[in-house]
From Swiss-Prot:
Source organism (scientific name): Ectopseudomonas mendocina (strain ymp)
Enzyme Commission number: 3.5.4.16
Site (May be catalytically important): 149
Biological process per Gene Ontology, one example term: tetrahydrofolate biosynthetic process
Keywords assigned by UniProt, alphabetized: Hydrolase
Protein's UniProt name: GTP cyclohydrolase FolE2
Length: 296
């Protein structure tokens, strides 16, 4: 059959006369490069259908335009160029185009003391939208960290004090006896509870932002929290992590405030939202805190 004779149903008029906010495709597989790493991403891409009389959009045009990013570095300039192409191919139908890129960035992280290192995945989402008001970009990342409960730590210290008083009340203190006692389960009778916790950070990028600040955001967040989860460890690393947790007690409220202060220092941010979840080991529910700045 001659290709020119193939029917194009999407180009036909509709009888409903109703514009649609967004029409497109979700979950398109796409290999990309991000922060120097090759990874597989999932992309949602679409346009508004502002012509109320048009039955549909040209999805194949969006799909083919997206393939121009395959295997290439994902940059703000590349995203803007892609959205411009989407609008150009739908100039008679659409006033806005948008896409979401989802994936997990693998980063190598060193151990605290030893020469070991390992890889961690950082889930991310990049949201981009082009409309009559210009380009709008948002970046979202997730990172895991350890949190030790300050209340539980205080209760554990109290129990240790009580056991010390019971053990040495009727005898003069001897340095070696106390040292042995401190290294025994008889002496350290309680430990505070800790849990793996997750922070979700949403950053709205400033208009003058040139590069995706993914690494800068992750580094700032992990510095603020102080106890990011580890990868490969030896006993010396595990001991250093125990020390870091003991000197870094925090409720979910503390974590949210630390992250808020850290994100306020990022020049690439015009607005942000923070959400932390502490998956409590004491309770059957989570402890959650949120903070935001200039977010609406």
């Amino acid at each position: 059959m001659n290709e020119q004779l193939l029917p194009d149903i999407a180009a036909q008029a509709t009888h409903h006369d109703l514009p649609l906010h967004w029409v497109g495709m979700a979950g398109i597989a796409l290999p990309i490069q991000l922060a120097g790493q090759a990874l597989n991403a999932s992309v949602d891409i679409g346009v508004s259908l502002d012509d109320a009389g048009a039955r549909g959009i040209h999805m194949s045009r969006l799909y083919l335009a997206l393939q121009g990013l395959a295997g290439k570095p994902l940059t703000l300039a590349a995203l803007q160029h892609l959205l411009d192409d989407c609008l150009s191919s739908h100039h008679e139908l659409s006033d806005s185009a948008s896409l979401t890129v989802r994936g997990a960035l693998p980063l190598q992280r060193p151990a605290l003391v030893s020469q070991l290192s390992g890889w961690k995945h950082y889930p991310f989402e990049i949201h981009a939208r082009q409309d009559g008001r210009g380009l709008h970009m948002e970046l979202q990342v997730e990172l895991d960290y350890s949190s030790t409960c300050p209340c539980s730590a205080a209760l554990a210290r109290q129990l240790i004090q009580q056991r010390f008083a019971e053990s040495f009340a009727q005898q003069p203190l001897n340095y070696l006896d106390v040292l042995d006692w401190l290294g025994s389960t008889q002496g350290i009778v309680a430990t505070p509870h800790s849990q793996r916790s997750t922070a979700t950070l949403q950053l709205r990028l400033a208009a003058d932002c040139i590069d995706l600040p993914l690494l800068a955001l992750l580094e700032a967040a992990e510095r603020a929290l102080g106890t990011p989860v580890q990868t490969a460890v030896k006993r010396a690393d595990e001991q250093a992590f125990a020390l870091a947790n003991g000197q870094n007690l925090m409720f979910c409220e503390d974590a949210a405030r630390r992250l808020h202060r850290a994100l306020r220092q990022l020049p690439q941010a015009s607005a942000f939202r923070v959400r932390v979840v502490h998956a409590e080991s004491l309770h059957a529910h989570d402890a959650v805190a949120e903070s935001r700045w200039n977010w609406s």
